[in-house]
């Protein structure tokens, strides 16, 4: 929720004379329109830092696995760089298919991870599903201990690979654990991702053409915020989203106005249609109960 106006011309000494950063001053021809843009981002920043985001899926980062292959003078292409690119492609695919997840750092798990019942806890968040990407060949001993305890309590682990190392050393115990279907749900990294594994009753999207849609959802005391963004600069995105709630409102980030937004209600669920122009966005508030006015 922070926008950084990158680069400022403090002087034109040295190499700076070859750079052409914008001048954020009345001298710029777009200055009179700049307030409208910054108000949009200010309202959006407030909205997307209010309430809390509560995702049920935790995707572990393969950081320690990549470090096993890292060498300063490695030729290109090299294994550690490829692993990073593959992992980025994996989580981007999840985002483009509207999977709600958080990323888990093993270093953070070391000090803030625990298991409570069938929930994998990290700080103030708790997860019912933990995902190990195909690039995860190693796990820290502390992470492996948490995963064993999580599985014993009935937690769901989805593994796209079989980690064979614990703290960088080959581990028969780890291989046996991740190969046990009673403890771990195996997913074939060579096959298309089965997104039904990540389905949640809280929210469901149709399949918008082109996979250009991204969304962000935050829980509030009396409802939830839903932000939709079209990442394409040339194509519109249209579709519907169904989520829990009884009434919807549009939060206009351009004008600051709040007004009703049409939705089809069935019981305690709303189906909302969206039509976003290229690079367009939509910020909605979905109330748990009907409200007047």
Residues covered by each model-derived region:
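Carbohydrate-binding surfaces of carbohydrate-active enzymes
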Residues: 1-293
């Amino acid at each position: 929720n922070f926008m950084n106006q990158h680069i400022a011309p403090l002087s034109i000494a040295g190499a700076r004379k070859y750079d052409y950063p914008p001048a954020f001053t009345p001298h710029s021809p777009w200055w009179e329109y700049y307030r409208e843009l910054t108000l949009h981002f200010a309202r959006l920043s407030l909205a997307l830092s209010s309430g809390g985001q509560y995702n049920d899926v935790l995707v572990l980062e393969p950081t320690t696995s990549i470090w096993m292959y890292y060498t300063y003078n490695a030729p290109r292409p090299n294994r550690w760089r490829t692993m990073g690119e593959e992992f980025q492609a994996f989580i981007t695919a999840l985002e483009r298919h509207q999977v709600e997840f958080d990323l888990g750092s093993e270093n953070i798990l070391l000090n803030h991870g625990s298991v409570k019942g069938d929930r994998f806890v990290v700080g103030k968040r708790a997860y019912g599903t933990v995902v190990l990407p195909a690039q995860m060949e190693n796990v820290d001993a502390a992470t492996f201990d948490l995963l064993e305890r999580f599985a014993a309590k009935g937690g769901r682990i989805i593994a796209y690979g079989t980690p064979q190392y614990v703290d960088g050393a080959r581990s028969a115990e780890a291989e046996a654990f991740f190969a046990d279907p009673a403890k771990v749900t195996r997913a074939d990294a060579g096959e298309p991702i089965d997104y039904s594994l990540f389905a949640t009753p809280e929210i469901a999207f149709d399949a918008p053409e082109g996979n250009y849609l991204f969304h962000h959802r935050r829980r509030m005391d009396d409802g939830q915020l839903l932000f939709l963004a079209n990442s394409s600069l040339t194509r519109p995105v249209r579709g519907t989203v169904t989520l829990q709630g009884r009434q919807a409102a549009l939060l206009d980030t351009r004008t600051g106005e709040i007004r009703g937004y049409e939705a089809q209600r069935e019981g305690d669920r709303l189906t909302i249609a969206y039509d976003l122009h290229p690079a367009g966005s939509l910020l909605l508030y979905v109330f748990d109960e009907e409200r007047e006015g």
